[in-house]
């Protein structure tokens, strides 16, 4: 199963505003009529029950929404970019990789139709109609569209099943699953026969439930040994666990303790999953001889144990009856929870500070970071004296010059704003 992938998502950039003038007698330049740019498309993740793995992402890492169109004359706004909906299997967890290297879960798509907005499209830039003032009746300024959000995501598929069969490698998990369901896991007499989770459906008079075999766990699985990380995360989405032990093992209860320790060390909540303990290979003569001894040992530990044979089916019905009983209790508790309403969840990036401008001292002058004005500079011909004059008026209007002087700048010093150099 292809169940973990890193992808890059990019929302659409906003379209740039338009500098244009209508033809009208006695109005300078015919009067401004530049339209705004369209907004860039958003990126969504949506759970789809028709998908079963993340294989679609193996050869396509970058996913982009459409950009917004630029503004047009006659005050016409550009078309918004088309949204991008990325379909993922139910049970997918999306984690964002922050710039500081930290990881943050932003979406857990646990039900069919769950949708999360993970990247906002950039806002369209303003056309020159927005820059009209009493002193500037013919603005030659327009704004570049904002860039869309761009993030690196980790998508992890955690299987969703009612029951997980766990245990050491080669204890008979695959044999038990194939006996109970139509699933056909690989069965052989060597460790790690199963390298990915296998699910099957069990139909009983008490009801239908889904059972999954989680590949064998070994010591230090919580550190990733033996593909431990890949296996352990699947247990977190199951209601309960069948802990299968090998009756021919020298110390089955010690095996159980070691596996449970790995669950706890990986995620303490996993060790709290309800468990039914089953000892396999009761068809083996040695296990039959040890049966009462093993039963007493587990009883002293406060555990009820079921003896089964995944080969002959002995004891399996009794085990399943107990599992079904526990599941009924767990499912009844779930009924009180609110059903998913498929409301679109929205991921909002952490704010990067207040809008406005920031002044920084440089070796040979000063830098003014003003995102809104920089977008105008980026989209304007600053070599044109009239355009440059209008930008300077904006800088003055936003109190940038006064703030520079208060910060220690003196007349004649070089100032950098975006790609424009100017002097105080």
From Swiss-Prot:
Domain of life (superkingdom): Bacteria
Domain OCT, chain residue ranges per copy: 349-424
Keyword Zinc-finger attached: no
One Pfam family, short name: MMR_HSR1
Segments forming domain Obg: 1-160
Keyword terms: Cytoplasm, GTP-binding, Hydrolase, Magnesium, Metal-binding, Nucleotide-binding
Keyword Metal-binding belongs to the record: yes
Cofactor(s) the protein needs: Mg(2+)
Enzyme class: hydrolase
E.C. number(s) listed in UniProt: 3.6.5.-
Biological processes per GO annotation: ribosome biogenesis
Coarse class of the protein's main subcellular location: cytoplasm
Subcellular compartments: Cytoplasm
Cellular component, GO annotation: cytoplasm
Residues reported to bind Mg(2+): 174, 194
PANTHER family: DEVELOPMENTALLY REGULATED GTP-BINDING PROTEIN-RELATED (PTHR11702), MITOCHONDRIAL RIBOSOME-ASSOCIATED GTPASE 2 (PTHR11702:SF31)
Function in brief: An essential GTPase which binds GTP, GDP and possibly (p)ppGpp with moderate affinity, with high nucleotide exchange rates and a fairly low GTP hydrolysis rate. Plays a role in control of the cell cycle, stress response, ribosome biogenesis and in those bacteria that undergo differentiation, in morphogenesis control.
Subunit and interaction comment: Monomer.
Protein name: GTPase Obg
Gene name linked to the record: obg
């Amino acid at each position: 199963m292809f169940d973990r992938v890193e992808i890059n998502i990019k929302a659409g950039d906003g379209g740039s505003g338009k500098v244009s003038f209508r033809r009208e007698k006695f109005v300078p330049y015919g009067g401004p009529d530049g339209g705004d740019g369209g907004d860039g498309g958003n990126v969504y993740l949506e759970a789809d029950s028709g998908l079963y793995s993340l294989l679609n992402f193996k050869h396509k890492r970058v996913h982009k929404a459409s950009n917004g169109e630029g503004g047009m004359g006659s005050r016409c706004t550009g078309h918004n970019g088309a949204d991008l909906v990325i379909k993922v299997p139910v049970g997918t967890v999306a984690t964002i990789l922050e710039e500081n290297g930290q990881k943050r879960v932003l979406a857990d798509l646990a039900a069919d139709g769950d949708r999360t907005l993970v990247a906002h499209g950039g806002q369209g830039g303003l056309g020159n109609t927005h820059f009209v003032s009493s002193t500037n009746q013919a603005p030659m300024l327009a704004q570049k569209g904002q860039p869309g959000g761009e993030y690196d995501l980790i998508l992890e598929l955690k299987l969703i099943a009612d029951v997980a069969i766990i245990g050491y490698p080669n204890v008979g998990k695959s044999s038990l699953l194939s006996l109970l369901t139509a699933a056909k896991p690989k069965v052989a007499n060597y460790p790690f026969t199963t390298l990915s989770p296998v699910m099957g459906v069990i139909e009983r008079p008490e009801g239908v439930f889904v059972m999954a075999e989680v590949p064998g766990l070994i010591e230090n699985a919580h550190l990733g040994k033996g593909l431990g990380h890949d296996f352990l995360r699947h247990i977190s989405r199951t209601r309960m666990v069948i802990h299968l032990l090998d009756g021919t093992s020298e110390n089955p209860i010690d095996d159980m303790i070691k596996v449970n320790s790995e669950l706890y060390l990986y995620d303490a909540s996993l060790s709290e999953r309800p468990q039914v303990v089953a000892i396999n290979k009761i068809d083996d003569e040695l296990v039959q001889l040890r049966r009462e001894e093993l039963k007493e040992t587990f009883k002293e530990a406060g555990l009820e144990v079921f003896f089964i044979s995944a080969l002959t089916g002995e004891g399996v019905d009794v085990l399943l009856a107990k599992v079904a009983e526990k599941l009924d209790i767990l499912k009844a508790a779930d009924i009180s929870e609110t059903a998913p309403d498929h409301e679109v969840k929205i991921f909002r990036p952490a704010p990067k500070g207040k809008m406005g401008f920031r002044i920084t001292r440089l070796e040979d002058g000063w830098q003014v970071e003003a995102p809104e004005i920089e977008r105008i500079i980026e989209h304007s011909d600053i070599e044109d004296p009239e355009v440059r004059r209008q930008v300077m008026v904006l800088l003055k209007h936003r109190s940038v010059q006064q703030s520079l002087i208060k910060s220690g700048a003196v007349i004649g010093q070089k100032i950098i704003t975006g790609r424009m150099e100017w002097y105080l």
